[in-house]
């Protein structure tokens, strides 16, 4: 299969796309991201005495024990959230298949571009980044740019653009690929992308 003038592997850029696999991988990614620091106090943790607030009989009021139970305002919460880890395992095969399918989806919709060079000079400039995207004709698109090596100038030039994310090939993931309308990939990244979906 060819994308522009670049020959790419069919087993990575032209596999059958199954939405359910993509959904599984995205769900797993978002679950891993969750902080899970939510917390509520139970009746044992709220700052109230455990004494009985009124006599059992004789007052005409309903029967009550302590003040910290969940039926009172300011009392504890019954079955409320506690800090927890939302991460769960997903087989590596499924993760790799998901990435292949995400890349294939973009390739089949002509949403991948390969470039020889992404050079924005010595100093980070958002203006230069916008010019670079305009020259490619993708300045209005939501973009994922894959670069071959860490480059502070590129990171800083693009980071002020809300519709652009910059990743190394090793950081390529299903969520970000699907988030973008178009992928701009440096040609030198291709072998490392193959390595990622095989490793």
Swiss-Prot record:
- Which molecular function term from Gene Ontology is one that the record holds? structural constituent of ribosome
Any single biological process term in GO:
translation
Q: Which UniProt keywords apply?
A: Ribonucleoprotein, Ribosomal protein, RNA-binding, rRNA-binding
Gene3D superfamilies in UniProt: 3.40.1370.10
GO CC terms of this entry: ribonucleoprotein complex; ribosome
NCBIfam families, alphabetically? rplD_bact
| Quaternary structure (record) | Part of the 50S ribosomal subunit.
User: What is this protein's function per UniProt?
Assistant: One of the primary rRNA binding proteins, this protein initially binds near the 5'-end of the 23S rRNA. It is important during the early stages of 50S assembly. It makes multiple contacts with different domains of the 23S rRNA in the assembled 50S subunit and ribosome. Forms part of the polypeptide exit tunnel.
Q: Into which family does the record put it?
A: Belongs to the universal ribosomal protein uL4 family.
Q: What is this protein called?
A: Large ribosomal subunit protein uL4
């Amino acid at each position: 299969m060819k994308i522009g003038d670049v020959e790419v592997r069919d087993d990575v850029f032209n596999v059958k796309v199954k939405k359910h696999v993509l959904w599984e991988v995205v769900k797993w990614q978002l679950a891993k991201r969750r902080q899970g620091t939510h917390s509520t106090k139970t009746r044992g943790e709220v700052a109230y005495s455990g004494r009985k607030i009124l006599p059992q009989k004789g007052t005409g009021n309903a029967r009550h024990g302590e003040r910290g139970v969940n039926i009172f305002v300011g009392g504890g919460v019954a079955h409320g959230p506690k800090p927890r880890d939302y991460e769960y395992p997903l087989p590596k095969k499924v993760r790799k298949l998901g990435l292949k399918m995400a890349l294939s989806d973009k390739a089949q919709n002509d949403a991948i571009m390969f470039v020889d060079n992404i050079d924005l000079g010595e100093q980070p400039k958002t203006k230069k980044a916008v010019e670079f995207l305009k020259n490619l004709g993708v300045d209005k698109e939501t973009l994922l740019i894959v670069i071959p090596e860490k480059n502070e100038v590129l990171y800083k030039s693009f980071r002020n653009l809300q519709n652009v994310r910059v990743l190394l090939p090793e950081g390529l993931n299903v969520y970000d690929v699907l988030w973008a309308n178009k992928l701009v990939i440096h040609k030198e990244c291709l072998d490392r992308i193959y390595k990622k979906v095989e490793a």
